[in-house]
Amino acid sequence: MSSSSEPVDDYLSSILGNIAGKKIAIISEVQELVEKTEHADLFQKVLAYCQKHGACVTTNHVEKYTSILPVYYTIAMAEASSTMNRFDGIRYTGTMAGESFLDIVKRTRSNLLGREVKRRIMIGNFVLSHEHYASYYLKAKQLASEIKQEFLKILNENDLILMPTTYGEAFTIGSKVSDPVSMYIEDIFTVTANILGVPAMSVPIAKGSNGLPLGLQLISRPFGEREIYNMADFLSHFGGEA
C-alpha cells in the first residue's frame, strides 16, 4: 500500500451548491449500453438538469470500452489467485486437520473458502499459467493501459465523467448467486475507476420499478475529489425533473 504526499483540498469547502461552468463528460459507448437499460430516461433527465444549471455536457469516445469488463476481471482474478495463495491453513485463516502439509492445505481451502473465492482462484491460475499468461494476462494489462490513457485524456479536458453505477436497480441479496456472470456484468460501469485508479463515487438518484435504488457514478481525475463532492451534493437535490 502506498500514499501520496500531495496536499488535498478541504472537501467541505469544495461544496459550492452549483455546477455552473463545469464540464461533464459522457462516453458514447456507455450511452449505447444505457439505452438498453432502466436508466435511459433518467440519465437524460439528469443531463438536462445539469445543463439547465449551467454545466456543459460533452460526448466522448473510448474505442476499447467494450473490452473493459473482461480486461478488469482477467486482471482481478489473477491478482485474487495470487493473493489467496497465502491462505494455506498454516500461516493465515483457520485450519483443517490433515495427515500432511498438502493434505492440510487441500482440506482447508476446500472447506473454508467460499464458492466465489474458489472460482477466482481457478480462473486466476488459468490466466497466469505458462500457456495462457501472454494471451490473457499480458494482453489484459496492455488493454487496461490503453483504456486508461483514453480516459485520462477525457478527464484532463473535463471536470467529471458521469455514468450509471449498474445496469439496473439494486438487486436483492442472493438473487444472482446462481448466475455469477450476470453479477459480473453489473460491474461494467464501476470497474472503470478500478482500471483508471481514480476517485469515483456512486450516488442514489432515484428508485427503480421494484422500489430499489438506481445510482449514478461520478468519476474524476486523480485528486479530483472536490469535483465529485460538489456534484454529489448538487445531484442530491435532483427531484426527477428535466
What are the language-model segments listed below?
Residues M84, L162, G211:
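Conserved Sensor-2/SRH helix of P-loop NTPases
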Residues L69-T83:
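Charged, often glycine-rich, active-site loop that binds/positions anionic groups
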Residues L12-S13, L33, V71, K106-L112:
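A short glycine-threonine-serine/GTX helix/turn-capping micro-motif
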Residues C56-H61, M201:
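General small-molecule cofactor/ligand-binding pocket signal
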Residues I19, Y65, D88-I195:
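Serine-dependent amide/ester hydrolase catalytic core
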Residues T74-A78, P180-V181, I219-S220:
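Short, hinge-like loop/turn segments at secondary-structure boundaries
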Residues A40-Q44, M77, E186-F189, A232:
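Amphipathic alpha-helical segments in well-structured domains
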